[in-house]
Amino acid sequence: MKHIVKHIHFVGIGGAGMSGIAEVLVNLGYAVSGSDLSRNAVTDRLEALGARIAIGHDAANIEGANAVVVSTAVRSDNPEVLAARHQGVPIVQRAVMLAELMRLKQGIAIAGTHGKTTTTSLVASVLAAGGLDPTFVIGGRLISAGANARLGTGDFIVAEADESDASFLNLYPVIEVITNIDADHMDTYGHDFARLKQAFIEFTQRLPFYGSAVVCVDDPNVRQIIPFISKPVVRYGLSPDAQVRAEDIDARDGRMHFTVIREGRAPLAVVLNMPGLHNVQNALAAIAIATDLGVSDDAIQLALAEFNGVGRRFQRYGEVPSADGGQYTLIDDYGHHPVEMAATIAAARGAFPGRRLVLAFQPHRYTRTRDCFDDFVNVLSTVDALVLTEVYAAGEAAIPTASGDALSRALRAVGKVDPVFVATVDDVPDALAKVAQNGDVVITMGAGSIGGVPAKLVQHIQQKA
């Protein structure tokens, strides 16, 4: 590619999926430019690495580019897209560019409705501990690396494979992981769950004959597609028929202690430095891959025990002063689907037994809120106190029956929790200051702008003091 393409421009370079690819390309020696609507820590990092960053979208931003990379979130009438089309500059989907990176190395692609980012991070961390020095492209910031991407010197590239727009079908890795299959982004599949499952089957068909599909057999939908996978399968999970499984699981001090059982290997005692059964499953995927690639048991144990997590995935901000003179534990999480939320709430209950759980939740997308409305009501009813915001639209038109206010009224009718509804995320710090008490565990959750709230909470309390 490099003998033809010298300069690559990214429309929306500050996004999690785009920025990682851009960083790897910068480190490969390409001239990289990009635009976004606002600056953030990611754009600042890319600029420091040598990328040219423009704030705002303008046709002039693509000057000199040999290719323009877009995600499915970029509209076709974006001025940079229109300019590229007018000038005959190739417009490349993000997943296609990721596929090009995978051609340079052996790809390990992590797919599934939930858990992709954490699992990708665990795989990258375990392989790095084993001396394989992988390249990785992750949808969140790996805290230990301080970045969501890194160019390694080893043979492997570890990356997320996105099913939300079916773009994972552009990838041709040598190892695939399927964590689970759930009903999300159903517009892509015509609201036909069978089509979604078929897409995952087609994803496994991208594997070479020597590749392997590493699949979580605890998920019933994954289990259903296994008979249709024609490539070698490695089963992981808590189920008795898993080839890599966890036994004797014990949650203590915010960590998961368990024994790994692998066919033909001695039992392996593991301590995972994060809570939740779902993260035990994610770790098992990493252990399965690491074992297959010859990583030592000592390296596996070390990597999992020292794993510092991923930004916005049960990210702990420590103790924050509460308005009553005490303090509460603050956690931030990206969860935005009821299944993810239930797993995070269960992890918090396990990590902090007996403590009151306060959730500040921003729903993400009106269509998801509509499609999962009853499930949202059920999962939100399991917390002890709730601050609920209006839906983060993510470019969608409002649906009055699937608004944050409608969700709040439905929760109040069920009667298990009395939500405090606020119209905007800017109102969350003040609402939490009135709700949170000494000894509480407070979780801010959602895939939208609520990710900026934790830093504001500390500032809010300091201003009130």
UniProtKB/Swiss-Prot annotation:
<protein>
    <recommendedName>
        <fullName>UDP-N-acetylmuramate--L-alanine ligase</fullName>
        <ecNumber>6.3.2.8</ecNumber>
    </recommendedName>
</protein>
<dbReference type="GO" id="GO:0008360">
    <property type="term" value="P:regulation of cell shape"/>
</dbReference>
<dbReference type="Pfam" id="PF08245">
    <property type="entry name" value="Mur_ligase_M"/>
</dbReference>
<comment type="function">
    <text>Cell wall formation.</text>
</comment>
<dbReference type="InterPro" id="IPR013221">
    <property type="entry name" value="Mur_ligase_cen"/>
</dbReference>
<keyword id="KW-0963">Cytoplasm</keyword>
<keyword id="KW-0436">Ligase</keyword>
<keyword id="KW-0132">Cell division</keyword>
<comment type="pathway">
    <text>Cell wall biogenesis; peptidoglycan biosynthesis.</text>
</comment>
<keyword id="KW-0547">Nucleotide-binding</keyword>
<dbReference type="GO" id="GO:0051301">
    <property type="term" value="P:cell division"/>
</dbReference>
<dbReference type="InterPro" id="IPR005758">
    <property type="entry name" value="UDP-N-AcMur_Ala_ligase_MurC"/>
</dbReference>
<dbReference type="GO" id="GO:0005737">
    <property type="term" value="C:cytoplasm"/>
</dbReference>
<dbReference type="GO" id="GO:0008763">
    <property type="term" value="F:UDP-N-acetylmuramate-L-alanine ligase activity"/>
</dbReference>
<dbReference type="Pfam" id="PF02875">
    <property type="entry name" value="Mur_ligase_C"/>
</dbReference>
<dbReference type="InterPro" id="IPR004101">
    <property type="entry name" value="Mur_ligase_C"/>
</dbReference>
<dbReference type="GO" id="GO:0005524">
    <property type="term" value="F:ATP binding"/>
</dbReference>
<dbReference type="InterPro" id="IPR036565">
    <property type="entry name" value="Mur-like_cat_sf"/>
</dbReference>
<dbReference type="GO" id="GO:0071555">
    <property type="term" value="P:cell wall organization"/>
</dbReference>
<dbReference type="InterPro" id="IPR000713">
    <property type="entry name" value="Mur_ligase_N"/>
</dbReference>
<keyword id="KW-0961">Cell wall biogenesis/degradation</keyword>
<dbReference type="GO" id="GO:0009252">
    <property type="term" value="P:peptidoglycan biosynthetic process"/>
</dbReference>
<dbReference type="Pfam" id="PF01225">
    <property type="entry name" value="Mur_ligase"/>
</dbReference>
<keyword id="KW-0131">Cell cycle</keyword>
<feature type="binding site">
    <location>
        <begin position="112"/>
        <end position="118"/>
    </location>
    <ligand>
        <name>ATP</name>
    </ligand>
</feature>
<dbReference type="InterPro" id="IPR036615">
    <property type="entry name" value="Mur_ligase_C_dom_sf"/>
</dbReference>
<keyword id="KW-0573">Peptidoglycan synthesis</keyword>
<keyword id="KW-0067">ATP-binding</keyword>
<comment type="similarity">
    <text>Belongs to the MurCDEF family.</text>
</comment>
<dbReference type="InterPro" id="IPR050061">
    <property type="entry name" value="MurCDEF_pg_biosynth"/>
</dbReference>
<keyword id="KW-0133">Cell shape</keyword>
